[in-house]
């Protein structure tokens, strides 16, 4: 449904809310609990599930749980926090932020933060994950990421590519585009992936 909403593809049916999200002129999103197309609900719930698991891992590391490789677990925790909060910020106007220390209360409704604040937080977590991976020369197993994508070099490049992608993807207006930190985007991109996946 998000592809049709972005005019990337089309569909002859209204499956998964495609018609509702992609009709033009745009119509208001049906945000009631009775709405049958759960395209945003499933996305929302899945990303908060990843965030909860990532926070639990981070909490365990911070409180001395015995792991074979606590640095690797901490890096995975920070990466999970970054990607879940970052991708929530790409889609929603408000994000409820939390990490291993608990809720990070924003000024919005029921403690929500704006998408800009959420992305700033997510990129901070991503930068922490990159720093841990680089300083500890961490990698992930072939089982976790097949095809060599879990090597330290590939992992660091992947995280940098995600930073560039999230930073640019979060721009929602011409004004935001004009004031974006393009130097940071370039720094991420230059340290990112240069090869394609097969």
Question: Across the structure, where does each feature detected by a protein language model lie?
Answer:
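Structured, solvent-exposed acidic/aromatic patches
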Residues: 16-198
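Acidic, glycine-rich segments characteristic of secretory precursors and extracytoplasmic regions
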Residues: 1-15
């Amino acid at each position: 449904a998000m592809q049709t909403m972005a005019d990337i593809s089309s569909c002859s049916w209204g499956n998964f809310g495609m018609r509702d999200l992609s009709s033009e002129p745009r119509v208001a999103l049906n945000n009631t609990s009775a709405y049958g197309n759960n395209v945003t609900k499933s996305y929302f719930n899945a990303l908060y599930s990843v965030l909860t698991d990532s926070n639990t891992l981070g909490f365990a590391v911070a409180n001395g749980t015995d792991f074979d490789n606590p640095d690797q677990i901490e890096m995975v925790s920070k990466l999970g926090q970054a990607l879940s909060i970052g991708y929530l910020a790409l889609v929603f106007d408000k994000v409820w932020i939390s990490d291993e220390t608990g809720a990070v209360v924003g000024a919005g409704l029921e403690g929500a933060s704006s998408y800009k604040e959420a992305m700033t937080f997510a990129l901070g977590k991503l930068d922490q994950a990159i720093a841990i991976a680089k300083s500890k020369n961490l990698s992930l197993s072939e089982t976790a990421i097949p095809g060599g994508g879990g090597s330290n070099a590939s992992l660091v490049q992947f995280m940098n590519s995600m930073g560039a992608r999230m930073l640019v993807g979060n721009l929602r207006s011409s004004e935001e585009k004009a004031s974006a930190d393009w130097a940071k985007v370039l720094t991420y991109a230059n340290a990112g992936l240069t090869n394609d996946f097969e």
